[in-house]
């Protein structure tokens, strides 16, 4: 109910843009689906744009057109949703996708977490903020922070903040290409969309943005 009241308050001034910070936090899956459907209906009826801040990859896959991935207060990768899920170019993004359970596989091993802890925002390191936790780090990552630059040969507007993406021919930082394909697979995005749709059982079918 509180989320609905806040949405009503936000719409009272007929805004063109609404910033929704974790709009489904602490909700069960049924109420979560109803809130998401409400946001989608408002966007369609009033032509209101939404910026969703969320840690839920299912919401990202089912609700967004473009994604900005942030780490330690910085944008580390941005692309349209399909491109990002199919072709992640920053190790942090790749790590997030590795943590998604695959619905088409029977996993014998545990999901792989991102090791380590986020940096102290009061005393950030001079180089890449993800470097202490990155398994593909190199010396330059510790020394200087890379810029957010276009990914070579991307299918859409795609930028990443990673020295590996900039320096490797064609863009990319993974050596094990077979493992890379396992993560950057379009099935991952489709599975998340199906999972989001499956929880929407009371307020009608959910369409995907």
Please give the residue ranges for each predicted region.
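Short glycine/serine/threonine-biased micro-segments
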Residues: 6, 18, 24, 114, ...
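Short, flexible, glycine/charge-rich loop motifs used to bind or transfer phosphoryl groups or to couple energy/partner
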Residues: 8, 41, 57, 118, ...
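ABC nucleotide-binding domain signature
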Residues: 6, 51, 68, 127-129, ...
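Long, low-complexity, intrinsically disordered segments
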Residues: 199-209
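Charged, flexible cofactor/metal-binding loops and thiol motifs
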Residues: 80-195, 199-200
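P-loop NTP-binding/switch modules centered on Walker-like glycine-rich loops
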Residues: 15, 19-23, 27-109
């Amino acid at each position: 109910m509180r989320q609905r009241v806040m949405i009503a308050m936000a719409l009272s001034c007929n805004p063109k843009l609404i910033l929704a910070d974790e709009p489904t936090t602490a909700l069960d899956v049924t109420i979560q689906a109803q809130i998401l459907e409400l946001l989608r209906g408002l966007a369609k009826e009033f032509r209101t744009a939404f910026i969703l801040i969320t840690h839920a990859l299912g919401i990202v896959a089912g609700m967004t057109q473009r994604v900005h991935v942030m780490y330690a207060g910085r944008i580390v990768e941005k692309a349209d949703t399909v491109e990002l899920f199919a072709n992640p170019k920053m190790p942090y993004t790749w790590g997030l996708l590795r943590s998604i359970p695959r619905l088409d596989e029977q996993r014998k091993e545990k999901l792989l977490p991102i090791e380590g802890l986020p940096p102290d925002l009061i005393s950030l390191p001079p180089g890449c903020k993800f470097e202490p936790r990155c398994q593909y780090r190199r010396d330059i990552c510790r020394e200087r922070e890379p810029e957010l630059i276009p990914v070579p040969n991307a299918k859409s507007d795609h930028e990443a903040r990673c020295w590996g993406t900039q320096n490797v021919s064609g863009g990319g930082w993974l050596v094990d290409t077979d493992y890379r394909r396992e993560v950057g697979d379009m099935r991952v995005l489709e599975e998340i969309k199906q999972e989001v749709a499956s929880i929407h059982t009371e307020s009608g079918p959910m369409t995907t943005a």
